């Protein structure tokens, strides 16, 4: 059972979740034409971003480790969408290698036990020249809150053989009295020698 199961029933009604997914979608579609793409929505939750993307996509595989979150998404019966309750890793993801034009991870990567290992897996799942896009809380150097500095994301992209296309603050979220910035990283798969596959 995932720790996120407890949030599933109320997740779609959370104003922060709704606003975050809308802002993520808007920033994504301003940067990448999603028409006709095969997309992996990694850590999809109840599928707020999947719902926004599915009219444009050729196909979406929406994965989350929370079976209850996936249950909420599955009940929406979105066309061209395959919801999977799975803790995706380098072993069980092998059948998906070279499958996706685009992988999105919205407010997920900062909570992964091994961010770089997940990036390496994403690279294997992408088609040649495929894109990976993440949104996470932007933190400053030395902060211990969940999130990343731009330098941390850049270093991970480099280490995992991605070319950084864009790395910038995409939007902010109101949390109490604070405006919390969200960083968006866009990277493209490249081959072992630095060129594009």
Where are these regions (language model features)?
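Conserved class I S-adenosyl-L-methionine
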Residues: 1-34, 72, 140
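Class I SAM-dependent methyltransferase SAM/SAH-binding core
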Residues: 46-91
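A short acidic, Gly/Pro-enriched loop at the edge of an enzyme's catalytic core
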Residues: 93-103
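A short SAM/SAH-binding and catalytic strip from SAM-dependent methyltransferases
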Residues: 102-114
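A short glycine-rich, Lys/Arg-flanked "PGG" loop and its adjoining helix->strand segment in the class I
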Residues: 117-128
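Conserved beta-strand signature within the Rossmann-like core of class I S-adenosyl-L-methionine
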Residues: 130-137
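Short alpha-helix
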Residues: 146-161
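Core SAM-dependent methyltransferase catalytic element
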Residues: 174-197
């Amino acid at each position: 059972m995932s720790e996120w199961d407890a949030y599933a029933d109320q997740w779609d009604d959370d104003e922060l979740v709704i606003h975050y997914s809308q802002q993520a979608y808007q920033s994504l579609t301003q940067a990448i034409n999603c028409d006709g793409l095969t997309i992996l929505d990694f850590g999809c939750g109840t599928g707020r971003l999947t719902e926004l993307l599915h009219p444009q996509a050729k196909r979406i595989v929406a994965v989350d480790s929370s079976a209850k979150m996936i249950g909420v998404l599955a009940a929406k019966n979105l066309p061209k969408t395959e919801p999977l309750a799975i803790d995706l890793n380098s072993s069980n993801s092998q059948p998906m290698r070279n499958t996706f034009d685009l992988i999105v991870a919205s407010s997920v990567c900062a909570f992964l036990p091994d961010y770089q290992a997940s990036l390496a897996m994403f690279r294997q799942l992408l088609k040649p020249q495929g894109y990976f896009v993440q949104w996470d809380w932007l933190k400053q150097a030395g902060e211990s809150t969940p999130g990343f500095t731009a330098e941390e994301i850049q270093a991970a992209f480099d280490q995992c053989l991605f070319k950084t296309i864009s790395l910038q603050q995409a939007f902010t979220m109101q949390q109490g009295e604070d405006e919390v910035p969200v960083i968006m990283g866009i990277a493209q798969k490249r081959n072992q020698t630095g060129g594009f596959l």
